[in-house]
Amino acid sequence: STPIKSSAASDVYKRQLPSNVALCVNPNDTYCKVKAADGYTYYMAQDLLDTVLGKLAKDDEPAYEVLESFPGTALEHKEYEPLFACAKECADKQNKKGFFVTCDTYVTMTDGTGIVHIAPAFGEDDANVGRNYDLPFVQFVNEKGELTEETPFAGIFVKKADPEVLKDLDARGQLFDAPKFEHEYPHCWRCDTPLIYYARESWYIRETAVKDDLIKNNNTVNWIPESIGKGRFGNWLENIQDWAISRNRYWGTPLNIWECEGCGHQECIGGRKELAERAGDPKAAEVELHRPYIDEVTFTCPDCGKVMHRVPEVIDCWFDSGAMPFAQYHYPFENKDVFEKQFPAQFISEAVDQTRGWFHSLMAESTLLFNKAPYENVIVLGHVQDENGQKMSKSKGNAVDPFDALENYGADAIRWYFYVNSAPWLPNRFHGKAVTEGQRKFMGTLWNTYAFYVLYAEIDQFNPTEHTLEYDKLSIMDRWLLSRLYSTVKEVDEDLDNYKIPETAKALQSFVEDMSNWYVRRCRDRFWAKGMEQDKMNAYMTLYTALVTISKAAAPMIPFMTESIYQNLVCNLDSKAPESIHLCDFPKVKEEWIDKELETQMKQLLDIVVLGRALIHI
């Protein structure tokens, strides 16, 4: 291969340069060999020549002269002189070739020189290139974030090492320029401390081996919205990587692998019984399965006779989350029938970021163990934002304490806000005004209607258990309300079956508004009438039926208010009734009481009234 005598490579993280083992160009872009005004010959991307070399131009002399142009592939495998001797020494010990040009399409033409440095120990793209070209693995940063003794910068923390590396390169005449770039960089989500990319040995689950099964199983799931299942999560599975399941921590589920201190033989222990058998000690079956206790259990290697110890890693907590469906029942050791009856789950719900979290861990483990999806229906939730649409953060001071919100507005009001505000998968701007508005429109109206009934039922000593709702004797208003009631129950039932949450909430709200603002207002004189004539009894029974039935339909959404209504209207009068509204069946639709023609006519009348009221205020 032809050596490169002078190339201009760019790098953002200077502390990685001592670990450099290759350069990388984009195979699809054009590169040039140029003679620059400073007397040096450079290789770099054609699109970036003016950006990088333009400042070398003089009044009577251009910044550079193009000697050759060629595709990026022409540079592949060309060798260059290592920046640091320590990297060459490390590569030689591994008997691997390095310090040549590689190709990958991740290299961009937005900044730098179009030639990037490669250090496989520091970054996913670099690691991928390293695997593709079987590059040496050089890692001159320790776990404390300090450069190691092999480098000229031993003991210096990585962030402080950047200027030292630049000084060293400049002193050796190998630094062309050190411009500042603004770029995205990972920070700790809790304290905003900059992180460092760092490769370390891990245990993996080879998910790539079951990629097709993962995609097939995901296609059986009803995702709401479908765009998440087919798009975000589907794309994640299309590009699935092997899952690094080990963590170097003290806490967590210990990785159940024992390794021989002599020959390296490894065994995966499948349970307490097997552990006791291998240890030759019945007490091992009772050991606390966490560190440090589990680490004390050792046994003899069958290959060389030396001692086998548990490896020090623990398991990623997301692996625990994916094991939830069977681990909660101690399956497969017991409760086999219970598990099989309840798996897969009919429905789960979590936030959109769980496409890489719980949704993934459940799907991965279910596919690996049972080759089927672990859930049938998924509602994906959008994130809760502040009233300005910003992500809530304690550090920014815009986070809402959920306990304060519950204290101020009540659980039902907050639940109702999320149901009625927007589709579940869209972000929600949470603020008090929106909660109280929903509380007023629906919950306040329902409660006022209930209070109206209770007030006059107590005055008249009306007991609904002593009367029967006789449909043939009902007025048009009564029949209309019952028709609206069971049309609403039917709509709510169908919407919930299809996971249409806002539609369900709006159907309930619409009915409650009609019941309060039209039925009760038009029928007040009937409740005020003297005695207990048939018409008055019909009004009471109609309103009672509507209140109890709509409360049962709304109970999953506003459990506390509906429970309060049920306790007073039902349990207080009927000792044989279920002790809670949440132990009742969902209301059954009485199709024979649904009169769509009557509903249409009443809707037209309501529209006329609304228009008439509007004209009054003109």
Where are these regions (language model features)?
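Residue patterns forming the tRNA-binding/recognition surfaces of aminoacyl-tRNA synthetases
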Residues: 1, 7-20, 32, 74-81, ...
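Secondary-structure transition/capping motifs at alpha-helix termini
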Residues: 90, 131-140, 167-177, 248, ...
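Protease-associated
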Residues: 18-23, 29-115, 124
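Alpha-helical recognition segments enriched in aromatics with Gly/Pro capping
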Residues: 133-144, 249-251, 274-427
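Conserved oxyanion/phosphate-binding beta-strand-loop segments in alpha/beta enzyme cores
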Residues: 61-65, 69-106, 193-194, 198-216, ...
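Active-site-adjacent bridging/hinge elements
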Residues: 94-107, 139-141, 211-218, 325-342, ...
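Conserved phosphate/anionic-ligand binding catalytic regions in large, soluble enzymes, centered on
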Residues: 7-26, 188-190, 249-250, 254-255, ...
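Acidic, turn-prone loop/beta-hairpin segments
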Residues: 460-490, 521-611
